[in-house]
């Protein structure tokens, strides 16, 4: 008897990957291994349901690959160091997790000696590139299967196939589709498809439950979140989740992102990301007090590239390790507590407490009495600084300004 070919399906439990498991097992005769790579977006209940469904769909084995810590250590902390917001708006939420999901799937495929890897991406988005590119690089020679893309399947066709073969689940096309992750939730569909419309309150998974305002104190050590309102967290994932819990109650972190996809078309996505926006907001605020002008400037330049490369499936590019080294080194004096004021749908910065505060120094306070120089020193400095302009206008006296 001919041995069945092994295929690892990157299994999220959604429609496309559910169809993929059943179709490959039933129609193609593969020995299907369903692997759910969790980067912090799945609850225990969801993972349990995924396991039950995978076996019902025909998988011979189901595994959960927990890569949440790896995701934080190898990318997320650098996104915080760099205050990474794509187009100044979007914290690269779920998209930043895809590479680590793909890497986990690739490692598992090599571990079991799989001949193929399958995923449920369509042909219209960025995820197909993130998954395919990672598999091509990390598992050369292993076949990549993408049924939804290659067979040009509609959601209804996949639903009909599953129902026909005895698997019934609620895959009814909802008005919105959600991708929930540790670093935020993206929202697609509905009003998102109309450039002139925003999302209604009901579109958000987390509703506003708090009124009034409160202060949030986020303490950082070497740029990493260390404590939330005085509570120390050795587990950085738990710290992020705590900030999310606090901020989501105010509906903080909601916005609309418009950007260019890897394949060249513009895309629009809604998102809710309380923890990312609060943590980045606090971290950036603290850096204004603790970093030099040029540290901030150059860090912003490389961080922008880091975010762009991460979004565009270039995490494996060697220059990313160089950027990470620079970002890591830049954080040695980013220590202290940033204080934020939260209110429904917004927050503002209040102040910082830091031993590395460069604002409070013996040299003087902005707009007040100088302590590190004399009045004559100041006048001399101003005269020297003005030299290039004085030379220029002395030679161009007729030039109007």
Regions found by a protein language model. Give the residues of each.
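Nucleotide-activated chemistry modules centered on ATP-dependent adenylation/adenylyltransferase
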Residues: 2-10, 15-401
């Amino acid at each position: 008897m001919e041995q069945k070919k092994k295929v690892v399906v990157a299994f999220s439990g959604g429609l496309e990957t559910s169809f993929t498991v059943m179709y490959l097992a039933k129609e193609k005769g593969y020995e299907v291994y369903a692997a759910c790579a969790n980067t912090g977006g799945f609850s225990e209940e969801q993972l349990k349901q995924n396991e039950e469904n995978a076996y019902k769909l025909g998988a011979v084995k189901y595994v959960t690959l927990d890569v949440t810590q790896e995701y934080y250590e190898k990318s997320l902390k650098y996104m915080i160091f760099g205050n990474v917001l794509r187009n100044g708006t979007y914290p690269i939420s779920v998209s930043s997790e895809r590479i680590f999901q793909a890497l986990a799937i690739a490692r598992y495929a090599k571990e079991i000696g799989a001949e193929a890897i399958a995923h449920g991406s369509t042909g219209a988005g960025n995820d197909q590139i993130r998954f395919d590119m990672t598999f091509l690089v990390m598992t050369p020679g292993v076949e990549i299967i993408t049924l939804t893309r290659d067979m040009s399947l509609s959601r209804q066709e996949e639903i009909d196939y599953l129902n026909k073969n005895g698997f019934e689940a609620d895959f009814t096309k909802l008005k919105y589709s959600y991708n929930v992750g540790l670093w935020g939730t993206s929202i697609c569909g509905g009003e998102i498809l109309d450039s002139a419309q925003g999302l209604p309150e009901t579109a958000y998974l987390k509703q506003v439950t708090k009124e009034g305002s409160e202060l949030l104190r986020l303490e950082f050590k070497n740029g990493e979140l260390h404590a939330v309102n005085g509570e120390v967290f050795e587990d950085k994932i738990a710290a992020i989740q705590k900030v999310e819990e606090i901020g989501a109650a105010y509906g903080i972190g909601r916005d609309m992102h418009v950007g260019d996809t890897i394949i060249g078309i513009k895309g629009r996505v809604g998102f809710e990301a309380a923890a990312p926006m609060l943590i980045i907001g606090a971290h950036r605020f603290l850096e204004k007090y603790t970093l030099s002008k040029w540290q901030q400037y150059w860090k912003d330049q490389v961080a922008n590239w880091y975010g762009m490369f991460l979004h565009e499936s270039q995490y494996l590019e060697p220059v990313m390790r160089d950027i990470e080294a620079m970002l890591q080194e830049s954080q040695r004096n980013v220590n202290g507590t940033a204080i934020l004021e939260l209110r429904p749908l917004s927050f503002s910065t209040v102040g910082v407490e830091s031993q590395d505060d460069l604002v409070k120094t013996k040299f003087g306070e902005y707009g007040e009495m100088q302590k590190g120089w004399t009045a004559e020193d100041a006048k001399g400095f101003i005269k020297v600084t003005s030299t290039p302009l004085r030379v220029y206008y002395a030679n161009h006296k007729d030039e109007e300004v």
